[in-house]
């Protein structure tokens, strides 16, 4: 019997890097609401008393970038200098310029189907049947812990009103013969008001954050709990650490369980395959696993700048495939259009929804129907996390001739 440990981590929406991600995606959403043809590459840095928003944008839209940035910060919960950052009074510096015409000529085409990739690169998508979300268990639980921290913190008349926005989680699982069997260790660090006793904090976190999330069947006498192990976490957010867009790419994806092509997501419109192709690869892998073609599936795609067709598509099922990986690859090529325009159409990616993805993981979330208002004031229906649908699983299973 083989036995090993595996660890993943997550961070809350109040973590400095996640503040930056959310601002970048809020800018993208605001522009897409007015201009579906926009090209956006938005980067944000937050540090004590200031948010710097930079990047390259080509659009006919106008947005109030300062007001938008302040709203994101305030909605997270940074509304006072006492907390360490105040969206009302912080400086907002706008350093956004235009996208290079050299890139435009490589991406734009008269025939939309021949739209070229916005850059070269390689992207991975992954799925496993070890959780209902088709995500690796360690990252799934890590996300849910910090999500629960935010839920409790924002709850009206919360008994844990002393919680502050910045938080981190980490979960270590024990695997026996490739199957998760127990939680070996949990780390939960949460920012808090001064004056909170360590004993009270530990008890509250156990009852209100850990207990509702962690599966009881995986907890045992030997499970180690590290709750605010430094003993104090008052200074947090952008005061404690500088935050930058795109610095939490492993948190955003599979927690280190699957490979990563290196490209970040937030602030990038769907013409950037760093984002759209990673979403598509997840969609493909999840449908392969949901179809029962494999227990685990990793899909890699790659592109050349200005070229529509992927330069490669490869599939690995780690010995769990019910049919050969080569046959799964052929089915993928037949059932999924992985050209940039094909991905955008397949997943309906050109509308505001991206700020929703910027915290608690881009994958393993439930598709959500919502409405948004465009630049003319008209209302539109849309779906976020469309890449989490398993609507092609049945067709894949039938094509594979599995009973």
Curated annotation (Swiss-Prot):
Looking up Pfam families in the UniProt record yields: S-AdoMet_synt_C, S-AdoMet_synt_M, S-AdoMet_synt_N
Q: Which cofactor does it need?
A: Mg(2+); K(+)
Tell me which InterPro entries the record gives: ADOMET_SYNTHASE_CS (IPR022631), S-AdoMet_synt_C (IPR022630), S-AdoMet_synt_central (IPR022629), S-AdoMet_synt_N (IPR022628), S-AdoMet_synthetase (IPR002133), S-AdoMet_synthetase_sfam (IPR022636)
**So where does L-methionine get bound?**
56, 99, 241, 272
> Quick one: where's region Flexible loop?
99-109
The EC number(s) this enzyme carries: 2.5.1.6
Q: Any S-S bridges, and between which cysteines? A: none
List localization entries.
Cytoplasm
* Highest taxon of the lineage: Bacteria
GO terms (molecular function) for this protein are: ATP binding; magnesium ion binding; methionine adenosyltransferase activity
Pathway(s) per entry: Amino-acid biosynthesis; S-adenosyl-L-methionine biosynthesis; S-adenosyl-L-methionine from L-methionine: step 1/1
The main enzyme category here is transferase
In which broad location class does this protein mainly occur, judging by the first location in its UniProt entry? cytoplasm
Provide the Gene Ontology terms for cellular component: cytoplasm
In which residues is Mg(2+) bound? Answer: 17
The residues listed in the UniProt record as binding K(+), with positions renumbered to this chain, are 43
**Annotated ATP binding sites:** 15, 166-168, 232-233, 241, 247-248, 264, 268
Function comment: Catalyzes the formation of S-adenosylmethionine (AdoMet) from methionine and ATP. The overall synthetic reaction is composed of two sequential steps, AdoMet formation and the subsequent tripolyphosphate hydrolysis which occurs prior to release of AdoMet from the enzyme.
- Describe the subunit structure: Homotetramer; dimer of dimers.
Say which family it is in. Answer: Belongs to the AdoMet synthase family.
Q: What is this protein called?
A: S-adenosylmethionine synthase
Q: What gene name does this entry carry?
A: metK
